[in-house]
Amino acid sequence: MIRPGRVRFLSIELRNFLSFKRATLSFSDFIALVGPNASGKSNAVAAIRLLREIPSYGLPLAIARRGGFDQLRHRSRGHPNDPSLKLTFEIEGSVRKSHYSLSLGAVKGGQYRVKKESGRVFYADGGRSGFDRGEESVHSYVEHPKWPRKEFSFGTGSSLAGQSALPAALVAGTTISAVLQRLQTVEVNPAKVAELQEPSSTEIFESDGSNVASIFESFDKTTRQEVTERLAAIVPGIVSIEVARLADKLTLRFKQASSDGAPAREFLAKQMSDGTLRAFSILVALLQDKQSGLLVIEEPEIAIHLGALSTLVQLLRSETEQTQILITTHSADIVDALPLDSLRVVWYEKGASNVAELAEHTKIPVRNGLITPGQLLRSDALDPQIA
């Protein structure tokens, strides 16, 4: 009952979070956030990353890694507002939606407190669990058709004011923590991949790729070969990829054949192109865990050859039966490779970011073959569906 099994993420609601005043981002198998620079795409990703890091690093560090509490607050006419997030998901086999919500408030001295925190989990076997955290106490429960409902309560105290209640929320907290850890963000820094890396924990893929060698080394032979074959579809000539140990550090060794028939040559990571290292890291993140989850990739087109973009998108879409995928992009070529229903428009208006699906009047000329989504993107004519 505690293990969630397959999970499908449905939506995330953002209230007074960074540039978002009030918005809901709905997920599907594959979605792409498109919009101008500074429209709010990265801020939506920041919300997902914050939730992902709560069970891994704790709420205080997760907030600190975003620049601190004050940086998270949306400002309307100069006045800061307190942020809140709500993630809705569904466990396969359950007949009801589950959720986790978190609301933060300011206190003197630039600090924060958890105003409200709650979760509801509905399991495939008919069981359910949940918790509610207020200013002074946490109340949790668990019930199942085969046993009586059990309830637990305890006080939070001032020492827990800035902490998440998930570790203390028993069954619901354990399940929600496992669900949040299935959110994975990828923002690869090729320089981090190229440099010699410290051996590290293989449980968490660092979004910048700084521990990708350790993650790749933890794969079994079949998965390593799968990564190699998929990278070869993007970067012609890749024959093999291995982890090399140099003293107490790790790096990657690529073997690549040339088109002139000469013997394949070996290259260390620092000798490979940024595009190759980015594509490799994205594939490792994609295949690191066969459990269902949501993989978020910021601007996958950066440093990747134009001709390889469609191949990368095809590889990503081929995994959506197992893993939901969200990307942010400015690439018209990527947009042209996606169904219209996969696109989400992000725009900034009247002091706040917004997100919505494509407007129907935008879809009609595309469906009639008069224009492509990529051409509309280039001309800033991907209009959102405004309620």
Predicted regions and their residues:
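Conserved catalytic network of the ASCE P-loop NTPase/AAA+ motor domain
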Residues: 77-80, 93-94, 286-289, 317-321, ...
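C-terminal lobe/lid and adjacent interdomain/linker elements of RecA-like ASCE P-loop ATPase modules
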Residues: 1-4, 310-387
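N-terminal pre-Walker A segment at the start of P-loop NTPase domains
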Residues: 1-21
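Phosphate-binding glycine-rich loops of NTP-binding sites
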Residues: 29-68, 279-280, 331
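Phosphate-binding P-loop
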Residues: 6, 22-28, 287-290
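Conserved P-loop NTP-binding catalytic core
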Residues: 46-112
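Electropositive, glycine-dotted interaction segments
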Residues: 94-229, 233, 239-242
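Conserved ABC ATPase signature
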Residues: 232, 236-287, 294-310, 366
